[in-house]
């Protein structure tokens, strides 16, 4: 039986960038990896309502730089940057090194697989019909300019006795084409009937030229708390 490879892992180094950007020798590697995991777990739990898309961690010269991609930067930054400062202190305690936090806004959350899957899971937990939640997400993504989107849910759908899987797709989602810019994410909805898994694939178009093109196009709008306040005025 054919199995599907992880779309993001398959494209790493071709058109996708890593979420942890650092190099460590054998002695330090495990510690760095463990602290990265703890930082991500802490941020996802603390900023649960901030619509976090992804977290990039870099380690320049005995320090750590965390870039948070979010659809709601105001919640992360807080009043006069107070929340960012609290986060910085907490992460410094976890990692034991100086921390710099940057915030990057996700302009189109409808085209971000992580945010779409989280949106569907939150709807399922609020007892919205799964077909309605799927269809709404697909229509919103296509309206915002996606070339294609596929959403799959699996589990005890609608409280059925036997778990099953259903999916809905619009446009094209070429999983075998390595230059295809496909965003993929998975989330879990914890309902009274059990856990329902949600998978989302979003095809945004093809990237020609590999990582060089990605570096050029994907320069994030990284903002410190001062820059963010300045831009809002």
From Swiss-Prot:
Cystine bridges: none
Segments forming domain KH type-2: 39-107
Any GO BP annotation: translation
Entry keyword RNA-binding: yes
GO MF: mRNA binding; rRNA binding; structural constituent of ribosome
Keywords: Ribonucleoprotein, Ribosomal protein, RNA-binding, rRNA-binding
GO CC annotation terms, alphabetical: cytosolic small ribosomal subunit
Highest taxon in the source lineage: Bacteria
SMART domains associated with the record: KH
InterPro entries associated with the record: KH_dom, KH_dom-like_a/b, KH_dom_type_2, KH_sf_prok-type, Ribosomal_S3_C_sf, Ribosomal_uS3_bac-typ, Ribosomal_uS3_C, Ribosomal_uS3_CS
Family annotation (Pfam families): KH_2, Ribosomal_S3_C
Biological role stated in the UniProt entry: Binds the lower part of the 30S subunit head. Binds mRNA in the 70S ribosome, positioning it for translation.
PANTHER family: 30S/40S RIBOSOMAL PROTEIN S3 (PTHR11760), SMALL RIBOSOMAL SUBUNIT PROTEIN US3C (PTHR11760:SF19)
Assembly and oligomerization: Part of the 30S ribosomal subunit. Forms a tight complex with proteins S10 and S14.
NCBIfam families in UniProt: rpsC_bact
Protein family (similarity comment): Belongs to the universal ribosomal protein uS3 family.
Protein name in UniProt: Small ribosomal subunit protein uS3
Native organism: Buchnera aphidicola subsp. Acyrthosiphon pisum (strain 5A)
Gene for this chain: rpsC
